[in-house]
């Protein structure tokens, strides 16, 4: 199964990387790598996250990070919608 990234998710990952790099380049690299590895797992196990609603939205907590990936599962691909820090109270449109 293929994985596609929505613009928001791509922007979220870029923002996370930039923010963390200001604090610690090593932490930024480690966190971004963990997020990317979690996304790669979705190719093989698209339903590994928790289903959030009836529209097919899922969430996956990224191990050893405070980040959550929101994504939708389609018959032929997984679409990454957003990446949030667990302290954020944001909603997807």
Regions picked out by a protein language model, each given a short descriptive name:
Residues 29, 62, 67-68, 72-93:
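Enriched for short, Lys/Arg-rich terminal
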Residues 2-57:
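Basic, Lys/Arg-enriched alpha-helical interface segments
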